[in-house]
Amino acid sequence: MSRAAAKFKIPMPVTKADFAFPSLRAFSIVVAADQQHGIGDGETIPWTVPETLAFFKDQTTLLRNKKPPTEKKRNAVVMGRKTWEVPLKFRPLKGRLNVVLSCRRPVDDLLAQLPEEKRAAAAADVVINGGLKEALHLLARPPYCSSIETAYCIGGARVYTEAMQSPCVEKLKEVYLTRVHTAPTCNRFYEFVRRRRARAAVDLESTSGVKVSDAAAHLSYEIMKYVPHNAEERQYLELIDRIMKTGLVKEDRTGVGTISLFGAQMFSLRDNQLPLLTTKRVFWRGVCEELIWFLRGETNAHVLADKDIHIWDGNGSREFLDSRGLTENKEMDLGPVYGFQWRHFGADYKGFDANYDEGVDQIKTIVETLKTNDRRLLVTAWNPCALHKMAVRPCHLLGQFYVNTQTKELSCMLYQRCCDMGLGVPFNIASYALLTILIAKATGLRPGELVHTLGTAHVYSNHVEALKEQLQRVPVAFPVLVFKKEREFLEDYESTDMEVVDYVPYPPIKMEMAV
């Protein structure tokens, strides 16, 4: 039932260059310091702990899957000129893109320091840039936005200081701080501990505990990982915690049972941010394909199943449709659900294989009226006249769009009447974030915010233990979304046209869907 005819489609303008990529690349810091936060004396690091050197090499070289770098994917290490001047035999740091910060020296000067036999190979491993801000701007754009998996800031003191100042600190994802227990002899200091109090809250995600080196005169050390406090995802986790502690235990349609509260969450979409929750991996490809399926007006669950996305299989089964009295529907025909209401509101539903050119096209109307600064920008999936024909009644049922005429930003407020906090809500947050981003692209606006208002926010009883596990995890920074390919029409986008960059979630947590 795809809206293939061009007259029904929504044209997409070419994205302006400033909108296509985040302003700066997210980055991590790797640093070793003594108990007084000293990191060196301007020339050397006054200790040698083989275990911490091995950690530095592995952390900055290996990819997130713990495998070595490849021709298509590696990490970047961003450093000042003095940090670059490690012993000559180590230059450039192998298997990594070396980004050296210098306003005066061209890259040819750095390569000239190397033995002649190393220069040709090193040319592809070394780039030079001004300051950290300029380097992060470079790494946020092609080819580096796709070829670099993680950018690491590795010093020295001036570079660390810039990293903890705006605008760079807003892109900080992680700090790997190795604390070496040794007598203080440094005159260069890393300011993370002091600046974190003044600038942004951080969470200690993990620690190795204090260990004693086997080879460094029995020096002790501790490797700690800090992450900036993710207040937006904390809203989600704190609501789950409140539901499980104070919610009302109720029976529900599925027979599983719920614990519920009647409850708004807000997520920023600025600078390409995508609120894809990090305390468990969210099935991004499923989110993306389902939203595109909605935007095409589809109601045939086979379309998703054929792409190995089975989120609608249970509701489209013969058994479930018959239980809803939809005995005339073909298997996997969900009836006039979300996509049909978005694109054909009020039309008579005749099955997923019929062609439709009637009804109100709410999505196209929103795109067209946004250009006139209209305030009546609503899309609803709740059609009382058609509820009895739907396999499931809409949970996320109303979106309102709003334009900030000063910043040219588009925001969306989603009202969701029924909120499965374990499985559905993480999906819905990402889905309506993507919807807002796509409509912003279609109208030449910047994405602003997603405000998520929850009606009955509930936890299924069979999700409680899994969510307790999730609540023990520390949320990290959200990823960003970049578009690898432009399309002429909104409905023509595919999930492969988009790339999520710097998504480093915890592993998935299995939860059964209540049907």
Swiss-Prot record:
Gene3D superfamilies: Dihydrofolate Reductase, subunit A, Thymidylate synthase/dCMP hydroxymethylase domain. Bifunctional enzyme. Involved in de novo dTMP biosynthesis. Key enzyme in folate metabolism. Catalyzes an essential reaction for de novo glycine and purine synthesis, DNA precursor synthesis, and for the conversion of dUMP to dTMP. In the N-terminal section; belongs to the dihydrofolate reductase family. In the C-terminal section; belongs to the thymidylate synthase family. HAMAP family: Thymidy_synth_bact. DUMP binds at R253, H396, Q416, R417, C418, C419, D420, N428, H458, V459, Y460. One of its GO terms (cellular component) is mitochondrion. Residues 233-515 are annotated as: Thymidylate synthase. Substrate binds at V30, I154, Y160, T178. This is Bifunctional dihydrofolate reductase-thymidylate synthase. The active site is at C395. GO terms for molecular function: dihydrofolate reductase activity; thymidylate synthase activity. NADP(+) binds at residues 32, 38-44, 81-83, 101-104, 155-162. Its EC number is 1.5.1.3, 2.1.1.45.
